[in-house]
Amino acid sequence: MVQSLNLGGAQNSQAASGIRRINRLPIVVVIVLAVAFLGIIFYGLASRGLYFGRDKGPESSSGEPASTFADQIKRGVTDGIIGEPQQQTTFQPTPVETKQVDEKASNPFTPTPEQRRGQELEPEAVWRARLEREQQEQYLRERQRQRMARLQANDAAYDAPLAIDRGKLEARTATDDTSAANTSTAISPTAGASDLYAAALRAGLGGQNIDPNGQKSKEDFFNTDLKDLGYLPNRVVPQQSLYELKRGSVIPATLITGINSDLPGRITAQVSQNVYDSATGHRLLIPQGTKLFGRYDSKVSFGQSRVLVVWSDIIFPNGSTLQIVGMAGTDAEGYGGFKDKVNNHYFKTFGSAVMIALIGTGIDMSVPQSSTLATQDTASDAARRNFAETFGRVADRTIQRNMDVQPTLEIRPGYKFNVLVDQDIIFNGIYRN
């Protein structure tokens, strides 16, 4: 029966014997590795559970808070939360405790010793000696300071020149003015010793402390009469006559002749109002219509607008004359000098310059230009160049000469002014024609 089931016969048996069976060794190795891996995982989980299970009791806990684990994880990284500022406690020294001694009860009738004062006064003799020593020390210091100042002043005076020209000293501190050089005078014989000494000091110092604005001379002028402090040297002088015209009074007048500062000259004026005595104001001293005779200054600097006028004589209507020795004239408002018209000669200064420039330009344009090379000098080029140079020099000289022309001040007749009385005038009596 078994043979009948063998349908393929011998050929099928040979074919089956030719097939090779797969090896089972890799499958066994894979299964062993998987079992080992699962065993390791199971062992790890089991051992971890057993380890944590031991610490669940209160007796087995380490006592460390749970926050330490978080700190270990952060490893010192602080929180990103800004808290309130911590108050720093300043160091304060501990006060020394003083033990108070309990006052013992004492008998009020028992005499107690007097308490000593905190600071006893030194004896009067010692105090007076110390005060006298301090005063003597101050006195010696002041004497030494004055002695050193005197020695320095003497050295400066010894180095000063023997001849002192006060005009040069004033010109050094004043502005460059031509009139100052003409009016400079040598030192007056009536000058005081203090003025001479001050001038010698300034000359000895030389140019060390130069005052460009002349402030020192202004202070000297202001304090001329205040050098000697204390009582005034002069006493009150009573009125010498009933017919006096005191200093500070004014004589109103009107100019008759005009003034032109191109040349110096004499002028006349007429008193416009009656002038009475200074004490009562009822005694007529100078009647209306009295003539005044004076002169004016023709030296005018650039920018000046006033004319300096002085009056020398008063001629009364009855023919009598009084010399008033150069009293100054002021305008109606009290300003020094007269001011009316000012001619600065601007047209002459700039007009001549413009005219010469136009003439030079016309001559330069009228000369034909050279057609030759620039390196060659022709007659036309030489003529044009000479004309330009000549007119340039003439223009410079003309402008410079016109710049030196002083302004012309003109005061027209009829100008109202006042004569300022600077000295007391005593008249013979009330004026009678």
UniProtKB/Swiss-Prot annotation:
Membrane topology of the entry: Single-pass membrane protein
Disulfide-bond pairs as recorded: none
Principal localisation: membrane
Pfam families assigned: TrbI (PF03743)
Keyword set, alphabetical order: Conjugation, Membrane, Plasmid, Transmembrane, Transmembrane helix
Region (Disordered) residue spans: 84-124
TM stretches of this protein: 25-45
Biased composition, class Basic and acidic residues, residue ranges: 114-124
Subcellular location: Membrane
Biased composition (Low complexity): 85-95
InterPro entries per record: T4SS_VirB10/TraB/TrbI, T4SS_VirB10/TrbI
Any one GO cellular component localisation term in the record: membrane
NCBIfam families: PRK13831.1
Family to which this protein belongs: Belongs to the TrbI/VirB10 family.
Protein name per its UniProtKB record: Conjugal transfer protein TrbI
Species per Swiss-Prot/TrEMBL record: Rhizobium radiobacter
